[in-house]
């Protein structure tokens, strides 16, 4: 029994010992001696695989030589060129595009200032403000178009009276001068026009009565002076702000 165990141990030791590497061989392609053994192909001792340091190619002893270019199997690390990624470039362009409309909004807000200074320029600035808000982001002002009609949430006060406007065109540059705003026509309220005319006539009559009771008789020239004064007064008087009503569908 003991003899059997000794033979078994000797067989295991013999099997565990690796065979010595084959001697270096000359390169089959360039005939260079600067070669080294790498491994056995398919774990077969009859197919040792070598590497030539001169032409930097592999070959198997006793096997066919493949047409491999010089240095084709080299895995040297190549220097990478730092190029900006596409996502980073898109994000930069998006930020650049979003910052520009906000600058326009700030300029328009600065131009609006007080509405009493200039009615036409202020309302035009409001129109440009809404146009810039539409360009910022489609989700923020989804249903608002620069050329559509919107309804204001407040009234604009000019001079001493109040100017009420039910609809105005956001995309228009001068909203008060145009006769049609947002596709709707506007006309003066007959009641307000009658009151203004009556007030104007009363003022003229009072001036005429004062001139007639002053004791100075001008004869036929009084009517001419009265007409000239009336024309000058009409040109110099500032029309009282009135209410505009919507005339349209």
Swiss-Prot record:
Gene Ontology cellular-component annotations: nucleus
PANTHER family: DOF ZINC FINGER PROTEIN DOF1.4-RELATED (PTHR31992), DOF ZINC FINGER PROTEIN DOF4.2-RELATED (PTHR31992:SF126)
UniProtKB keywords: DNA-binding, Metal-binding, Nucleus, Transcription, Transcription regulation, Zinc, Zinc-finger
Transmembrane segments: none
Binding site for Zn(2+): 27, 30, 52, 55
Main location: nucleus
Source organism per UniProt: Arabidopsis thaliana
GO molecular function: DNA binding; DNA-binding transcription factor activity; zinc ion binding
Name of this chain's protein: Dof zinc finger protein DOF4.5
Annotated gene: DOF4.5
Taxonomic superkingdom: Eukaryota
Compartment annotation: Nucleus
Any single biological process term in GO: regulation of DNA-templated transcription
